[in-house]
UniProtKB/Swiss-Prot annotation:
GO biological process, one term: proton motive force-driven ATP synthesis
An example Gene Ontology CC term for this record: mitochondrial inner membrane
Molecular function as annotated in GO: proton transmembrane transporter activity
Source species taxonomy: Eukaryota, Metazoa, Chordata, Craniata, Vertebrata
Record-stated family: Belongs to the eukaryotic ATPase subunit F6 family.
Domain of life of the organism encoding this protein: Eukaryota
Subunit annotation: Component of the ATP synthase complex composed at least of ATP5F1A/subunit alpha, ATP5F1B/subunit beta, ATP5MC1/subunit c (homooctomer), MT-ATP6/subunit a, MT-ATP8/subunit 8, ATP5ME/subunit e, ATP5MF/subunit f, ATP5MG/subunit g, ATP5MK/subunit k, ATP5MJ/subunit j, ATP5F1C/subunit gamma, ATP5F1D/subunit delta, ATP5F1E/subunit epsilon, ATP5PF/subunit F6, ATP5PB/subunit b, ATP5PD/subunit d, ATP5PO/subunit OSCP.
Keywords: Acetylation, CF(0), Hydrogen ion transport, Ion transport, Membrane, Mitochondrion, Mitochondrion inner membrane, Transit peptide, Transport
Function recorded in the entry: Subunit F6, of the mitochondrial membrane ATP synthase complex (F(1)F(0) ATP synthase or Complex V) that produces ATP from ADP in the presence of a proton gradient across the membrane which is generated by electron transport complexes of the respiratory chain. ATP synthase complex consist of a soluble F(1) head domain - the catalytic core - and a membrane F(1) domain - the membrane proton channel. These two domains are linked by a central stalk rotating inside the F(1) region and a stationary peripheral stalk.
Signal peptide: none
Location of the protein in the cell: Mitochondrion; Mitochondrion inner membrane
Keyword Transport: yes
Transit peptide: 1-32
Protein name per UniProt: ATP synthase peripheral stalk subunit F6, mitochondrial
Amino acid sequence: MILQRLFRFSSIIRSAVSVHFRRNIGVTAVAFNKELDPVQKLFVDKIREYKSKRQTSGGPVDTGPEYQQELEKELFKLKQMFGKADMNTFPTFKFEDPKFEVIEKPPA
C-alpha cells in the first residue's frame, strides 16, 4: 500500500518536473539562438552602435551646439526658479519639531 502511494507520488513529481524542464528548454533554445532575422539583426546592430557612441561621447548622441545651448538655458531657468541650487544633488530638508503648549487639566 505504501509502495503504491510512493510510486504514484513519484510519477506525479516526474511528470511535473518534465513539464517544467520542457518549458524552460523551449525558452532557452530561443534565447540562445544566434540566427536572427534581418530586421532583428539590424535593430540589435543599431542598439549596439548607439551604445558605443554614447560611451565614447559620455552624453547625448548626435546632438549639435543648439542642443547644448537649449540645455544650458533650461538649467539656468531652473537655477533661477529654485534658488541657484545644485541641480545634480538631492535637496536637503530641515524639519523642526513642533512646540506644544502644556495645558493643565482642570480638576473634575
